Every structure is written in structure tokens, then in C-alpha cells.
């Protein structure tokens, strides 16, 4: 503990448990003050000494110089504590000028602007008066009746000056009591009886039925209760005395030219003192009331400007050309405010920065530090060593020696930096790997050398990037740097658990070349070797080269120790690579007896880590890097223009596509397809053409030349070293389609590639996309950084607090299937999670794992063999720990590959993992040069394996051609394997043709279904005759003539705009041969409602067959998807905003019925529940929106009734927390997956947990809660336990979802919320509620200057609590709180403390320990 007190501050920071904030009473302000300030003088302009009685008065605030009074009579430490009888200054340290407050006694009270102006006005709410009325009383001279006595006025009524004068004439001076100005408000507030108001409001709340009035009453009631609970008095919101900040916090600094630079606060204080003194003199002269009122108003404005000059643009705060003066509020809020600038982001000493260069000869734990920098950074250490060795007798001489760079100094420097790690940081630090520790190696020059393998963690490159160096000073800091932050400890990425120390660029190319197999046409026979030394000799002599095919005798050791050998076909390069592999049974030669690309290399590093541990991995990575660099330079791979081979088939493909597009134009001109359908088809056709050319180009470029050598560019892209297939496509294939800045795709593609060169027109077309990319980057970087900040803020107090919370809850993990393809297997979803229940093999009944067991790589085989399709695992969402989560609910710490440690700050890690790729991706939007990245629309379903078909919800009809047409909106095709396990599940849209029947066997690549992706059809279920109902030409349908084709279509238009269209419900009705309306299988009439924009395919009176398309609704033209579309989506999800056009979700299982329209704009849909006891649910859908259900359809709870994204709040309300979590995870992961970024689900779950912390009270039970109040879930559950024990009625509540910004501001800690956003509002609310900050989170503790309660600080906090206890309680506390973390080591120390001395007393204390 003594070392912690290194800088003397910590003792203050450690000596309290919580911080409370409240409104300061006049008495408390006077008690804090050391004296009243009446004079505006600051310093004497001749002597530059501070003036007595002024704003810098030493008598009030303390001496300017250490231990010296103003007149100079007392000048030494020995006089400390004496007050000079001549000048009245206490002799003490000048530091007190940072702590001692003064005050100004105001002649007239003023209202505090925060309580008056910050909306909603607190003073207004308490008095139940509108803000305008209060302002009129304060500034415009209106009167308020305090006591009506015998007059007809009401108490608290506001009357104008004219009415006041008339009333005074009528009723006399004592007829009634009314006041104006601040005194009136103060009097009203003083007379408030809060207890009586509370009782009245509670009665009102019970009797009122109006929702509006209820909300208003609840707000006022909450305010009144806060005042009662906190012990604040309402009249304290009116100031009669103002505190003055210590002078060293508002200093007077003289500039070079001798002019003083004054802090803005001094200006505000001077204005207040001036106006206050002037008012005091005026009052003695008994002037007219208007003069007094004006002077009081000016005083009020001056005080307002001091507290918050941004609220009203007062003249006083904008003095002439002096510009804006900063107020106290401005000093707190914003990026430059006290919280974010000085408390959360401090500047650090012992640091330097320089440009980085590559250090290929370094080991992973090393970095090259320039000698000049090291000399400066380690100066104090060198000084002490020089003095200790007697080389320099004094510190002054030691400094001189360092400056003149004497030879002795370098020897001492070498000794000092040995085993002393330094920290390297690269801005922006997006995740914790942006700050790592290294052992410094002294180098010449001025640039820092960085190990190539850590570049991806820092996201660094060597094009001029700079990095900062920091020196950890204390022993503890050095220990933490070495044990926790060393680059060798950061092998795995915390966001997905994959290695982040993986080779890239040149290294990959070198290893790829090393494992390549090139067939030399001239070599006929394959050489055979027995030993590696023979291979080396053959290589040296040029008999074989690195990539030749050879045979080699490979020795293999069996588990029992016997050695066997076998002949393998390989290359010398692969054998060279095999020499650096660690020896382990899981690492076989087969791993590298193949061409290694970046993907394989990553999985090898991962496997080495899992099999051999950290040390071996680090050594292996370094060796791998050296090999990669060596062979990349030996390979001679270069980038040549001739290497870009344009495929011969290009012209044919382009011609085919152009031909098809001409066909589409003809179809469009003949009126067979609509404009948007033609556009979509053209875009799709060009996408296909581009892909075909790219495929042929890859085929041509991947072949060896006549000498058996591979193409250099192909090697670079194929190995994953640089470039990608899409970039190669643009170099040698066809650039393809471009996107406009709006995101629309330009339908004329760029047919040329970069090798051929673009025409002027093509070049101009491509500038669109390129510029959009650059503009996007600039805008989105800021967006993504802000998202990360909000995520960190919402999750910062989420740490691992215990091993097991004891819950039996969890979530069901399943494989993720998108578009019929498994994008995340069950293995990858459950890896690193803890099983929530005992899990058995469904066939054999064998127990696979028990509840509470961590599922690691060794257990995954069991899951595969058992063919499980779902596993119930523990989740942060269902964890029941208080103030954090438990280790078992979180599972594996991805950065170390083992169960998470107690004290880990999982919230911050989750926020960084989700936020970091956002920034990365947004910085990279333009990498594909704006070419449109859009997949061809999926229009069919193909079996990807041999399987049996199972149909779910398949309502089909047979059309006139004998095709099976799907009529259900929720039809799914499930493919089962031979054992009957589900392998794939696809939803098939309404109107699709189905080629397979229930139970049919299909073979791989067989087509199961197909549909038109560009339109949504409406299909008849039975045969009959069509009749138009409410489809009136000119009102609800129009013939729309297509200008370019001259063909007209009947299109449904917005009938609400027409006078006659008020009550229309346009629909097509199906009649039988007798003219009666056909009844469908659901017992409903066959009437088909048509939305706005639908194109009618049938005439009135036309005969139709079952399965015919009678109407089609064109889908809008498709926009390109890239992360810039994705990032706002992620933000929308985390902020829990309603999507712009959100879909309506069904609340119950039931049947759909269409009701009568609601006015002109809405359409009624009823759902009649299956459960007859439930009421019918009614929904209002905007007219013209396409409902995806028909009358008579059966819908499940949670199904969508119309197109669009569902609202998350609806999902939570209807389906519950797990369904919401599944929806959010799948939506967020979809965005990241599109960019190839992998994030573990648990990070999203941690953020979600923070968003779900509050509940809404639906029934307060026997408590003081109000209906609709939002309370912390933990608080309610704790209260309910107490109520249950006492046999009282418990509180009922429903979970609510808060966006990350709202959740951050709603946190228990007002310090954390104030430092996030809306500082003044947060502090105002906290003050009148008398809030306490328990200091549980990381942010609050950083702000008050303590160790954070995570990691080492978590344990230190526990030990401090232990130190506070009686020694007899040590063991009990230790066993409950610390044994799980410190084990038996701690208990032996505690026994030592509790061993009685010979006289029976217990000596020693944990504090000493």
C-alpha cells in the first residue's frame, strides 16, 4: 500500500466510498468560504502584488509564495500556521490557493439559471407555473399574489403591474400581499409544504383517467419526492450568496508583452461585484422602483452569465468586441471541458513520439528505441545510477554528463533499460491492442523500429505513421506491463479469439512461394531423399530448386514411442518450413504438405497456440517471419504489366450480355415488363457477365507458363499477400458496374479494364464511385468513432465480479443459416461458452457435458458426432450477478483461450470489439474503387447436397401448366440428411414454383423451387371470373403510358387524394359461374386487395385459372450494400430506434381479417386469436403499404403483417428477451459478415445486457413506485424479495429496451453520465435528487483518481475492504470474497496476521501487507 502513495494524492482519493451531490444551501456556501469579496481589484499594476480584499486576496485565499505573508514579515517554514498581525495573511503553503473558496453576499437574491432555465424548468414544475409566467415575474415586473387575504385573487395568481396598482388603490396596502422579482419566487418556494403537495398529487394520480394529466402529475410528484428524500429545500434554488472559485483555478498570467491574460471567470466575478455594489449604494438612496428593478435584472443576468452564459445570449457575456466569455458550465461540458479534457484524458509525462520503421530482425517482444529518446525518457533513472556508482557526485553534474553524452552514460543507459518494458501506442487506439509493452533495444537514428507481426494489432503501416512511447515508472506498473501487456501475451484477438499475430504481405508471399509446387517440364524423374541435410546439399548444388517435386523419408513417432517412417511426396521448400515446426502429436507434416495461403497460415498459428502454448507460438511466429522475408526476396516475384492476362473469351461474353440486354429492351417496349423490372434485369445481366469474365481471367492467369512458372500477380492475390480477385478483375477482366453517389447502380458498365485503359466516357462514369468513396470515408470515420464512444460508455461498468451467479437460465445456440447457406456452424457459435444444462446424445443417451462445463475444442467433436442442432448455453443476458456478470455466464476470455478471470473489464472489451471494425471498415469503403458490390438477386433454390425434402406450412395450388404454386406466406423447405437431421432450411416466397414434394429425395444441385425476384405477385387460389371492385378509372386506377415504349399498363394509384376516393377499398373479386363470390378454403370470400403501385395483369370480366398471377407489385430498384449502408444500420440497432418504415408485428396466434378503413389514410387489420378467451387485436396499417398477409391467413405470434424491418421494442414486448437477442445478433452480425469481419456473439450480448437493465413498472404493489416509472431491474428484484418475505404485494414489471445513449445517461453513476453528454442537465437532476454515486464503474473511478475496479484494482479494492474490518472477521470475509481469486496463498497470510503474540494480542494488519 505504501508504494501506491507514491505521489501523495491517493490517500484522499481512497478515503471515501461514494460521492453525494446536492444543492448548496447559503449556510454551507458561507461555511466553505474563507471570507467575503467586496472589491474587484486583482493585482497592483506597479508592484504586481495581489491586492487585499480583491478577487485574489491573500488574506482570504492564502499566501502567494510558500510560507511567506504578503508584507514579508514572516518568511520561513518555522512560522507555519501563524497569522501575520500586519497584513492578516496566514503563513502556509501556497497550494491552499487551489482549495480555499471565497463568497459574494448578494444584496438581492437571484434565481439559479440551471434550475430556472434548463428544460423542464424545476422551479416552474415545483410551483406548478409555466416558465413564461416566472420569467415575467423575474424580468418584466409582473406581480404574484402570495396571500390574497380578503381579495378575489387566488394564491399564486400572476397579475400585471397595472392590475396590482388598481388593486392596491381598491383594497389598501394591507388588503393583500403580492411581490415581484426574485423575492416573490423565493417567498413562494419558502412557503411550499412538500409533504402536503405529495399527498395531493398522489390523490390526483389515483383519481385521474387522462393520460396527459397523469404524465404531468407523475413528473411533478417525482420532483417533490426527490426534494423530500434528498433533504434539499426549494428556496435554495434561489441564491443569496455566491461561492467564488479559488484563485489558482482562475489565474492571472502575464504574457510576454507584459499584458495580463485573465481567466474569463474573473471577468464574470468582477461584473457581479460591480453590479452588486452599485445596487447596494442605490438602495440607500431610495430611488424610483424602475431603477432598482433594472439594476436587479442586471445582477440576475451577470450571475446567469457566470453559471451558464450559453443559455441566454446576455449582453453581459458578450462585452463589445471582446467576444464570448466562458462560464462555469462551459468549463465542464464538451470535449474541451473539465471531464473529458483533464479528468478522463490526461497528458502523460515520461513519453515521446516518433515515426515508425520496420524492424525485421527484432524478436516479437522487442522494439527498437532511438538512443536519443531513451536518454531523455530514462534520465532520472540514469541520474540515480550515475550517483549511486559514484560516477557523478551530484544530480546537477549527472545531468550535465547526460547532456554532453559521455561514454559512461551509454553504459549506464544499457543497464537501466534492461528488463524495463516500455509501452508503445498508436492513435487511434480503437481496441486494447493499440497499446502494448515491449522490451526496448537501443538503435541509432531517430525512428522507432516496430516488429512486423504486431502491425495488424496496431493497424500500423510504414508510410509515415507515428507512435508514442510511454515509460512505466513504478514496480507495479512495470510488472503489469510485462505480465499483462507484453506483445507476446497478445497473440489472440479479444474480439474473435483468432490469432492476431499472423504473417501478412511479404511474409505470406514468401511462405506461399516456399510451399509452392512447380513442375519443370524438362525434369523427368522425381528425386528421393533420406535426410534433410541431403535436401539442403541438393538445393545448394542446384540439383533441385525450392519448388521441385521430391520424395522424402519422413520419420513418425507413435504414442508408444516407436518410430516408423514413410515416403512422402513434397518439395524442399515445405521441408525447410517443417524444420521450424514445434514437436507435437497434433502438428503433422500433412498440415504443410500443401500450398499455404494466408488462411492456412492463420489456422496453423492457431493450432500451434492451442497445442503447444504461448511460448512455442511466439518462437514459431518469429521463425516463420524470418523465413517468409528470406524467401519472398529469393523468389523474385514482381509486378509486371504482361502478368495481367486478359481472357480471350471476354469479347464473346460482352456480346452475349449486350444481346440479352437488347432483348430486355424489346420486352419492355412490348410492355411485357415494367421499367424497374428491365433495369433490375439489365443490372443482373451485367453482374453475371462481369463474374464470367472474372472467372475466365482467373482460369487463364492461374495456369503455369511453358517453363512451369506461376504468374506473379496471381501468386500475390491467391496467397492473400496483396490484392484480391475483385481487384484483379478490374486490372485484367472488366471493371463492371459503377454506383452513383446516391447508391443507385449506373446500368451501363465499364467494359474496359485498367490494362486496356478506360475511354473518356468510362473514366467519367467511374469518378462517381471513387469520389463517393473518399467523401464517405471522411464522414463515416467520425460516425464510427462516436459509436465506439457510446458503446464504451454504456458498457464501461460491466466487469466479471464472481465465478458463478448460480443461474439455471441461458440461451439456445443454433447454427446460423442465411439464404440457405450455413454461415456460422453450431461449433463456432458454442465454442468458448458454458453449458447451461446437462446435454445428452439424442440417439445413445450418453452425457456429452454437464451443466457449468466449458465447451472447448475437445468437446466440439462430441457435438458433431451426436448431430446436435442446438445447445443451451449460459449467456451474459441471463446472468444474475449484481453490478456485473459472472465468469461462467461469460465463458471463455477470447484473448487467452481460457475461462475469463474475475475482474476482467468485459464491457469495455465488448464495446471495443464491436466499435473497432466499424472504424476500420468505414476507412476502407473506397477500396474497390466504387465498383458496385452487389450479388445477383437470388431467384431459385438449389439443393447443395443429397437430401430428403420436408415442407413446412406449404399451401400449394396447381396452375394450368401443372406447376405447383406456393400460396403460403411462411412456407419453408427443410432438407434432411439420411439420419433425419436438419441440414438446411430455406424460406420460399409466396408465388414460387415448387419442383419437389413432401418426402421426395433430391440430389445435389437439383432445383427445388424458383420465383421472380423483381416482383411480388398476387395469385388466385381457385378458377373463376375477375370482377373489379372500387377500381375506378381516374380515381383508383390509371392507364400509365410508358413514354419510351408507347404501351400502357393499368396501375393502381393513390385514391385517397381524390374526392370520390374517401371510402374506396380497391380489390379484385373472383366470381364463380353463377356470379357469386367464390369461397376459399379458409371460408373467406375470394377478394384480393391491391396496394398503390400494383400493376393489374387481368381485365375486368376476364376468366382466370387457379395459380394465375392477377396483379404484380414491382420491387424498387436495388441499391448497393456496403458497410456505409451497414454502419448506420448498426447504430440504428444499438440506439433501439424505430426503423423508418417499420413492419407491424402480430401480438397473438390467430386468423387475419380486413376491417373497414380508418379515415382515408389507414387500413384496419384484425387478428382473431385462436384462444377464444382473448380479445380481437386491431392494427392500423398505412394505406398503400403492401401487407404480406391475406384475409384468412393464419399468423403466429411475432409474425410480420407487412414489409419492412420490425421494431425491436415490439419483438421484446411480444416474443421476449431471447427472441430480441437473436434478432439483434443476427442483424448486426449480417452487417459485419458482409465485410468479412468476425465478432463473437458474446460481445453483442454484453452490450444488450446493458441496454436491458431497466424495467417499466406495470403494477406498483405495496411500494411507492409509480405506474410507468423506469427502474433498474436489480433494484426491483431486490425489493420484491423483501416484499415476499414480509408477505406484501410484489411489484409487477415488463422489461424495456433502451438505446445506448439513453442507457448511458440513465446509469446509477451521475459522474459517468455527466462526463458523457448533457453535463448540465445530468448534474441539475442529480443535485435536486441528492444522488449518491457508489463509484462502481471504471469511468467514475478514473475521474476521482482511484485505481479502476477491474483487473488489479478489483483485487486491491477487496483487500482494502478486508483491511477495514476487525481482525476477527478477516477469515469470514476472505473465504466469501477472495478465496476464489487468491486461493490458499491469501489464507496463509491471514493466518499469520491472526496468530496471537505471547501476551495474547493480535498484531499486524492487512494494510501492512
UniProtKB/Swiss-Prot annotation:
One of its GO terms (molecular function) is DNA-directed RNA polymerase activity. It catalyses: RNA(n) + a ribonucleoside 5'-triphosphate = RNA(n+1) + diphosphate. Mg(2+) binds at residues 461, 463, 465. Zn(2+) 1 binds at residues 69, 71, 84, 87. Pfam families: RNA_pol_Rpb1_1, RNA_pol_Rpb1_2, RNA_pol_Rpb1_3, RNA_pol_Rpb1_4, RNA_pol_Rpb1_5. It is an enzyme of class 2 (transferase). Its EC number is 2.7.7.6. Binds 1 Mg(2+) ion per subunit. Binds 2 Zn(2+) ions per subunit. The keyword Nucleotidyltransferase applies. Belongs to the RNA polymerase beta' chain family. The RNAP catalytic core consists of 2 alpha, 1 beta, 1 beta' and 1 omega subunit. When a sigma factor is associated with the core the holoenzyme is formed, which can initiate transcription. This is DNA-directed RNA polymerase subunit beta'. It comes from Anaplasma phagocytophilum (strain HZ).
